[in-house]
Amino acid sequence: MGQLFSSPKSDENNDLPSSFTGYFKKFNTGRKIISQEILNLIELRMRKGNIQLTNSAISDALKEIDSSVLNVAVTGETGSGKSSFINTLRGIGNEEEGAAKTGVVEVTMERHPYKHPNIPNVVFWDLPGIGSTNFPPNTYLEKMKFYEYDFFIIISATRFKKNDIDIAKAISMMKKEFYFVRTKVDSDITNEADGKPQTFDKEKVLQDIRLNCVNTFRENGIAEPPIFLLSNKNVCHYDFPVLMDKLISDLPIYKRHNFMVSLPNITDSVIEKKRQFLKQRIWLEGFAADLVNIIPSLTFLLDSDLETLKKSMKFYRTVFGVDETSLQRLARDWEIEVDQVEAMIKSPAVFKPTDEETIQERLSRYIQEFCLANGYLLPKNSFLKEIFYLKYYFLDMVTEDAKTLLKEICLRN
């Protein structure tokens, strides 16, 4: 686990307000979960010594992050793979309970919401293809209540169809953000490789597909949107990770957190970005009234602290896909016992006492390990309860667990 904080080296770093805002400077603009304006407000209130207003500002920021709702409209013609795309983003299989219905026949005649199973404030709306409704483009968008969505994703497979162009034009005219996703590129690559084994060039095939999309938009007088090539069967390849990055960076700051932690753990990069988002959240929580004190913290954890820690660990394990349900799914897919999957990672055993070590002793050891690895968290005249350190420790542990399982998944596939 890498060093999270550096030791204070100047008077500027050696005060609480500067420590608070300075921490967020390590995250680039597209990765922050709180705006600079709010950070400046919190720092100002800290400098004035108004603890109540400071805590109020931090609490309000956390509430806005937690309560923000993201509505994503996904539209495309029958067979384009839009329902599979929605299921992929929700981290569930096409045949699992609650999955968006897939098929070669249009199964969506009205818009249908699909909440993310772990982050219910993230909602994907499966819209019927415009061709199946017989509505003109503008009427289609009105019927689908276009104004309710944060952005649109247009899904298209194989070659462009008139309906793809019509819906893109209508969305553009209404000044709504949209992204174009060309699916099933794995099939295109396979077909080219089989048909032209001597001259096959994978990168050229992808380049030609992308260029065809660009030219089609231009020929129809549409400013080309962000274009992404992907396969719902191989989401860790092609443009899927790039698409996720683009969507997050384009979102309003306060809506980024929920979307980021909802994403499937398809690459080490996605897992690491989740960790960076959650680090910021823990930092905000660390300055809330129940974690920052003007007197030294207790040398032991209260029962209420343990419950808070268990809740945090459960949340981290869920968003990183190492919770009990996810482990059971992996065990079923790999045809092994759940205990064997649990043995590959560390987080399931954190709150299980052993003959050698009680839970309290284990948590105390974690705190010591964390402090040795990270040095100063805040100026020496500030005191934080152990729960703050442990949340960071748990986050690092679960992140590494997720990477371990992802590596195992790749080896077995």
Curated annotation (Swiss-Prot):
Chain positions with (Microbial infection) Phosphothreonine modification: 102, 108
Location of the protein in the cell: Cytoplasm; Nucleus membrane; Endoplasmic reticulum membrane; Golgi apparatus, Golgi stack membrane
Listed Pfam families: IIGP
Gene3D superfamilies hit by this protein: P-loop containing nucleotide triphosphate hydrolases (3.40.50.300)
Effect of residue 213 to R: Blocks T.gondii ROP5 binding
Family designation: Belongs to the TRAFAC class dynamin-like GTPase superfamily. IRG family.
Protein name: Interferon-inducible GTPase 1
Organism per entry: Mus musculus
Upper classification of the organism: Eukaryota, Metazoa, Chordata, Craniata, Vertebrata
